Amino acid sequence: MQLNSLGFPRIGRRRELKFALEKYWRGESTQAELHEVARELRRTHWQWQVAAGIEQVPVGDFAFYDQVLTLSATLNAIPDRHRGEGAIDLDTLFRVARGRAPTGTDAPASEMTKYFNTNYHYLVPELKQDQVFSIAYEQFFDEVAEAQALGYKAKPVLLGPVSYLYLAKTVGQDFDKLSLLPNLLKAYAEILARFAAQGVTWVQLEEPILALELTHEWQAAISESYQALKTAQVKILLTSYYGSISHHQALVSALPVAGLHLDLVTAPEQLALFANALRPDQILSVGVVNGRNVWAAEVDLIVERIGSVARDLCSQDGSRLWIGTSCSLLHSPVDLEVETTLAPTLRQQLAFAKQKLLELANVRQLLQAPESVAAKEIVNTCLARREAKAQAADAKVIARVAALTPADYERVSEFTERQAVQQRKYRLPLLPTTTIGSFPQTPAIRGLRSRWRKGELSDAQYTEQLQQVTRDTIDRQLKLGIDVLVHGEAERNDMVEYFGEQLEGVGFTKNGWVQSYGSRCVKPPLIYGDVSRPKAMTVDWAVFAQSLTDKPVKGMLTGPVTILHWSFAREDISRDTIATQLALAIRDEVVDLQHAGIGIIQIDEPAFREGLPLKQSEWQAYLDWAVNAFKLSAAGVVDETQIHTHMCYSEFNDTIAAIAAMDADVITIETSRSRMELLNAFEDFEYPNEIGPGVYDIHSPNTPSVEAMVHLIEKAAQKVPVRQLWVNPDCGLKTRTWDEVEPALKNMVDATRELRRRLG
């Protein structure tokens, strides 16, 4: 009974890779020094895995930027603009990812987008109609040799051919990506032959698209691919993750592969279905430890769930069952051992990547020797952990959720009635101008926060300094002539962490970093218990800012769905229950802001779409509870209080009904890069509420002209009635400088005034 590691985080437990990359990019180290850091990380991570009982270490999970990009380089699928004169090398990959590198000519970076429904981002392969695939980069093979030289048995892991094509985009002429499959399969066959020549036994080919609802053409591509690769002199472990593949069971079970890996964390019900169809010569790898979360596995319950199938397989041949993580541990922080300041009650609930390896060994221990002393200790630990969790439950929060009624989710009046009341109260001009919330987080502001956290500034000194920043932010907006102001969020380091630090049931780590892309790492909050708000979180800052002007200043909050999706959320209750608890906490803040005289309140939901399940047939169930969570957070106010929300997506057509159901008085969205084409969804749906389509791209340092913004506002007015329109940037301005922000906002206000003159 082997233990199966699908992949391990590459960043290092103290983000060693991040710092080495950035040092190299700044020109402060050599490529040889960067490679040495990478080798040491791989060596350490392999050592940990072998020490935990992993017999075949994953190789190919390490990447200097992104594993999909590494595969593109291996396949010679690099855009021409990034190639340079010589062979593909590491700097080539950096030019693809970042648009520049220490060597070579700068060129626009490739597109980056989220990997399925995770918060990890991959570089989208760009494929031409005449694309020729061939081995052009040696990293995979070099690392196999490196592992073998250290005495380890290597199991290469790489994205399968069909998922690779699915994730790619076509460039140049419009054509069917699947027309490239035959040539791609020849390259994959060559890769597998190279692995075989190195003495590799097993290769993990990942086809995460199996968790999607695939068309007939893509299903046929799966079948064609693995028929073509069946002659390889290596054993293929066909690997799925992020969801059930039971809807493709007949297809998958017929494939000529030596083994199959199932994600039993997201879809435990598929075990029996595939186990019953397993051929006598196949192995089954069961992904039972969650690779995407931080919570200690309930090992005893896992064994209860898989026990009968496991015993049946092992009675035939003990080597036919592998115990694995649900997916790569890439999505988990590296090592709990470096967390020295966590409360013991929270620490005992956690397992990071290194600890999850030991959990695999614990599952095997319970399966093989359930009566042993070690097994009984494992069970007792699980029981004690669950008992502690039960004792920590907040009865008041649970009772409050249980007592909710349908009326708690609805505003007092319909939108048209609220709109009339709000227009009389605020008397805003046609095309009111506003911003999305944050203003530049200058080095001075970051320095203040750092000194305060170190104890070099008292709370009073810190508050006084930030009040001066807020005065300046309000003053700048008044001089620009913006209609609805914001306080600028100088006191906030992160839009989720700021709220999480003030909520009961939410904790934070010092080193719980996970890779988002390249050298960018994030440290998500831990929602470990029932969530409540012990006291007001933003009211003082909103009231202070409002005291500086007669113009309305928006209260700024992060919505419950976004806080949930950007956190590691507990697994012992449903995600919709957690969202409801968060919504009640935000609702309390909304009500307090209203009572303090803040009449316009924005509840941001940038991650609303990120929670959509991979299978479209499951979308509605998610949208129902996500919409309800937002409505619950916003519904406790009177008609005069205007609720805004902000979303930044590239697609609205398939969720426009849900967005309308949220019933925000005003929604601001990211549209400038699409030249307002995204508004087609709102036009076709006849979206009833007010909308602020972004009129300039805040991600660019360029100053948009008055004429360009006039044109965009006019385009928007062709799609949405002008009296429903607001004017605003695409997103928050936190990452820009004041030298960039002020000219852009001045032009935005001037463009709006020009249109008001034209429209009378």
Curated annotation (Swiss-Prot):
A Pfam family it matches? Meth_synt_2
Query: GO molecular-function annotation terms?
Result: 5-methyltetrahydropteroyltriglutamate-homocysteine S-methyltransferase activity; zinc ion binding
- Please list the GO biological process terms of this entry: methionine biosynthetic process; methylation
Tell me the residue numbers annotated for binding L-methionine.
436-438, 489, 604
Essential cofactor(s): Zn(2+)
Q: Which residues bind L-homocysteine?
A: 436-438, 489, 604
Q: What keywords appear on the UniProt entry?
A: Amino-acid biosynthesis, Metal-binding, Methionine biosynthesis, Methyltransferase, Repeat, Transferase, Zinc
TM spans, by residue?
none
Q: What does this protein do?
A: Catalyzes the transfer of a methyl group from 5-methyltetrahydrofolate to homocysteine resulting in methionine formation.
Q: Which HAMAP family match?
A: Meth_synth
**What name does UniProt use for this protein?**
5-methyltetrahydropteroyltriglutamate--homocysteine methyltransferase
Q: What is the originating organism of this protein?
A: Shewanella oneidensis (strain ATCC 700550 / JCM 31522 / CIP 106686 / LMG 19005 / NCIMB 14063 / MR-1)
